[in-house]
Amino acid sequence: MKWNDISKDQMKYDVTIPFIRQLAGPMDYTQGAMLNATKKDFYPCYFKPMSQGTRCHQLALYMILDSPLNMLCDSPTHYNKEIECTEFIASIPTVWNETRIIDGEVGEWIITARRNNSIWYVGGITNWTSRDVKLDLSFLPQGKYKIEIFKDGINADRNATDYKKDFFVTEDITKIHKLHLAPGGGFAMKIEGYLP
């Protein structure tokens, strides 16, 4: 799929496969591209391979797809230049105690939450349609949480590598209730219980 001609819609594939192929169990996907392109800017290039969609879309795939042997699809040089994203990817477990599909529609978008011990990882992606998604985290018990979130940057619709990282502590997890996803976009979040 990734090396096929430009007419292939990788974003639609990404928001379809979790609903169909994942029913059979874990799969290999090889996500994690650091060279990201908008629909307009993408082209197959052997010497400078890139992914369709935003950087946060790529990060979110680590939560959305169940793969106990995750890979990195890009050059080590690119990961060395993108330490913030690389460290986040390295922190994501490959085995889970619990999985919840929070919301989604086949071929449109999906939001998945996965728990490893007491830490939750939440990822959401969309097809080429930008959208505001509601994030229902009401399944989490009341308490104080430390949140790390990567979300599409304000210019991600023009520059797919643009993202914003936020880090904060909250006592009201429901405050994170709406996120904007750029075309081909996504978000990736780590939620840890927090004791002062």
Which ranges hold each PLM region?
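Glycan-recognition and catalytic regions of carbohydrate-active enzymes
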Residues: 74-121, 157-161
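C-terminal beta-strand-rich structural cap/linker in extracellular carbohydrate-active enzymes
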Residues: 166-196
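Conserved, mostly hydrophobic/aromatic
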Residues: 64, 122, 184
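Solvent-exposed beta-strand/loop surfaces of large extracellular or lumenal domains
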Residues: 149-174
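Extended hydrophobic-aromatic, low-complexity segments
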Residues: 73, 123-124, 131-135, 145-148, ...
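Active/binding-pocket-proximal capping segment
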Residues: 79-85, 128-131, 138-155
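Glycan-recognition surfaces
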Residues: 1-76, 102
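Carbohydrate-binding surface patches
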Residues: 106-142, 187-188
